[in-house]
């Protein structure tokens, strides 16, 4: 027997990194939102690494912030260390990474959800969806509560039929020994969704005061104040270091001699693990020529002794983990507080989704995060904000939002998932983005703040500050383009001191800045502005001027892509009626059901000849006799 428990615009299942962004995005747009989670003490919990950001991922956090999301603001308030990565490389691959106080991060994010006026936070286990006439109309919990909604977002993480594996021990569990979600997974199969089995792992945690830090290398944070959020004005200066050590030949020997006890090699683990975050067993076997592997010791917070042993992800038995740790410099006498483990879980095949993250099978049902086959908090949060935006907008009768591959890394991530699918936990990399010079850490606001403001997630006050910054960038570029730097003796001497060749004639400030030895700071010593320019404006001017040619080339490629994106494919096109398309391409097109010719061209197995035939049919207006 069930009972009617309430009516909402949007219900979010799960309150991990995808769930909190989905819920806040929905509620802040004006949709009455309910969040149901198995354990209220686990809101925004970090079951694996206590960090946010890194290559590509850090840019996603900036994009979430530019859209009006919460992850950037939250980590700025709760980090213990922050570093800019790849500073010696070009701006396209620079990214911020923060070590989190994982407990403070959780507390702060839960507090944010509790204070959100349009949002209700509730502990409960969802076991079934209410589906009527192919539409999701709500959820049913373990206690029989029926919650009705116009849209539902599933952000179930690694809880779906979760199973923890540690040596020869295996038991049903969510991450960190939380209760798993069994019946919801079975229900998804009943509804006809294709599920896959993935696996991830985590390393042991050790006690800080049993580490001999004198045998490790200190890894401090940056001295320069850093922030993910464009709104952050107060910076944490009291940072904690991380520490670097290495495995030893003895470590590898212990692993090799115990591979028969590893669930990965005994066949006990059936799920596919992440390629770019392998276990230590995998690293030792696959890279057996390497005498050692890096191990980073990362504090899990300011008020805990627990230290995360980054690089030692494992599911080997506890006794083997203890022996492994004792062979690592600095950890000879370490106390293991928690053993590492592997966790298997169900995910849906993501080609069953539209680019809005709504499922094709059931309307008004959205999915985001690890349920879609991704790995990583940032990838989850990026999907979460988009699913929350679109579920909220659909519930309110508004047009949904799709970010393209040239708009954001979030657009690349979602397009890869829904177009190509994934046969392993998907991790976002800079190499996955063909327009990465346009998708930089520094310009996320210029790319996405207008969208965030239009949909109601960016305040008018913040938008006015953004418009002021944009105007300042253009004004300074215009000034530097018009100013002529003359070949005076003083100027020539200064340029020579920087290792540059002398000026033959007067040169525009923008042209001088394009020289490799020059930057905004050096050029403005020769042609200073009347009023000092803010650092973020100066950085943007320098990048836009220095890389103008490359940026222009990328923008031309984007324009070509937009023409293909604008060639829409009707949803109910009958690919079987199009003669000449290869069998594999026909099957893939029917499965993915791309919305545009550009998306169709990105499907693996669909070649240019197939696209040409498809274009002919579309241009003739025949549309291959759309199937009824």
UniProtKB/Swiss-Prot annotation:
The keyword Ribosomal protein does not apply. Pfam families: GIDA, GIDA_C_1st, SAM_GIDA_C. One of its GO terms (molecular function) is flavin adenine dinucleotide binding. The gene is mnmG. FAD binds at residues 14-19, 126, 181, 370. NAD-binding protein involved in the addition of a carboxymethylaminomethyl (cmnm) group at the wobble position (U34) of certain tRNAs, forming tRNA-cmnm(5)s(2)U34. PANTHER family: GLUCOSE INHIBITED DIVISION PROTEIN A, PROTEIN MTO1 HOMOLOG, MITOCHONDRIAL. Belongs to the MnmG family. Homodimer. Heterotetramer of two MnmE and two MnmG subunits. This is tRNA uridine 5-carboxymethylaminomethyl modification enzyme MnmG. GO terms for cellular component: cytosol. Keywords: Cytoplasm, FAD, Flavoprotein, NAD, tRNA processing. InterPro entries: FAD/NAD-bd_sf (IPR036188), GIDA_C_N (IPR049312), MnmG (IPR004416), MnmG-rel (IPR002218), MnmG-rel_CS (IPR020595), MnmG_C (IPR026904), MnmG_C_subdom (IPR047001), MnmG_C_subdom_sf (IPR044920). It is found in: Cytoplasm. HAMAP family: MnmG_GidA. SMART domains: GIDA_assoc_3. NAD(+) binds at residues 273-287. The keyword Flavoprotein applies. Its cofactor is FAD. GO terms for biological process: tRNA methylation; tRNA wobble uridine modification.
């Amino acid at each position: 027997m069930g009972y009617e428990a309430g009516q909402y615009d949007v219900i979010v299942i799960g309150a991990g990194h995808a769930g909190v962004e989905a819920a806040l995005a929905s509620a802040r747009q004006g949709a009455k939102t309910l969040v149901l989670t198995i354990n209220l003490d686990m809101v925004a919990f970090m079951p694996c690494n206590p960090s946010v950001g890194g290559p590509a991922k850090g840019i996603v956090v900036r994009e979430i912030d530019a859209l009006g999301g919460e992850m950037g603001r939250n980590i700025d308030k709760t980090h213990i260390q922050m570093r800019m990565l790849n500073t010696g490389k070009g701006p396209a691959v620079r990214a911020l990474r923060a070590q989190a106080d994982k407990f403070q991060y959780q507390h702060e994010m839960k507090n944010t959800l509790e204070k959100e006026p349009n949002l209700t936070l509730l502990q409960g286990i969802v076991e079934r969806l209410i589906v009527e006439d192919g539409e999701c109309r709500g959820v049913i919990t373990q206690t029989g509560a029926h919650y009705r909604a116009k849209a539902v977002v599933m952000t179930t993480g690694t809880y779906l039929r979760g199973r923890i594996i540690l040596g020869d021990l295996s038991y049903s569990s969510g991450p960190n020994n939380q209760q798993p979600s069994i019946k919801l997974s079975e229900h998804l199969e009943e509804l006809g969704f294709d599920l896959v089995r993935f696996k991830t792992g985590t390393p042991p945690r050790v006690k800080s005061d049993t580490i001999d830090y004198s045998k490790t290398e200190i890894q401090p944070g940056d001295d320069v104040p850093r922030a993910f959020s464009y709104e952050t004005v107060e910076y944490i200066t009291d940072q904690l270091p991380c520490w670097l050590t290495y495995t030893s030949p003895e470590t590898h020997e212990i692993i090799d001699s115990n591979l028969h006890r590893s669930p990965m090699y005994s066949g006990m683990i059936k799920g596919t693990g992440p390629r770019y975050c392998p276990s230590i067993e995998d690293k030792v076997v696959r890279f057996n020529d390497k005498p050692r592997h890096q191990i980073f010791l990362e504090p899990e917070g300011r008020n805990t002794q627990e230290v995360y042993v980054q690089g030692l992800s494992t599911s080997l038995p506890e006794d083997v983990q203890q022996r492994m740790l004792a062979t690592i410099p600095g950890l000879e006498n370490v106390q293991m507080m928690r053993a590492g483990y592997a966790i298997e879980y169900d995910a849906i095949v993501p080609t069953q989704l539209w680019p809005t993250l709504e499922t094709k099978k059931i309307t008004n049902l959205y999915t985001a995060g690890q349920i879609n086959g991704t790995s990583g908090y940032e990838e989850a949060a990026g999907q979460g904000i988009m699913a929350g935006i679109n579920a909220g907008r659909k519930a309110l009768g508004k047009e949904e939002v799709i970010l393209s591959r040239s708009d954001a890394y979030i657009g690349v991530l979602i397009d890869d998932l829904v177009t190509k699918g994934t046969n392993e936990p998907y991790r976002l990399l800079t190499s996955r983005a063909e327009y990465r010079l346009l998708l930089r850490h520094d310009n996320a606001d210029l790319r996405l703040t207008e969208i965030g403001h239009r949909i109601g997630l960016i305040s008018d006050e913040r938008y006015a500050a953004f418009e002021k910054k944009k105007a300042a960038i253009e004004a300074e570029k215009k000034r530097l383009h018009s100013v002529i730097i003359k070949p005076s003796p003083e100027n020539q001497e200064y340029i020579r001191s920087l290792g540059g060749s002398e000026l033959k004639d007067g040169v525009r400030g923008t042209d001088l800045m394009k020289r490799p030895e020059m930057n905004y700071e050096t050029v403005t010593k020769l042609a200073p502005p009347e009023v000092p320019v803010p650092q973020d404006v100066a950085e943007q001017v320098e990048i836009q001027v220095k890389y103008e040619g490359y940026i222009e080339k990328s923008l031309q490629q984007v324009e070509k892509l937009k023409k293909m994106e604008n060639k829409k494919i009707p949803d109910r096109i009958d690919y079987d009626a199009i003669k000449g398309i290869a069998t594999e391409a026909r099957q893939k097109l029917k499965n993915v059901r791309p919305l545009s010719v550009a998306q169709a061209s990105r499907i693996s197995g669909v070649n240019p000849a197939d696209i040409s035939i498809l274009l002919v049919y579309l241009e003739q207006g025949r549309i291959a006799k759309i199937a009824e």
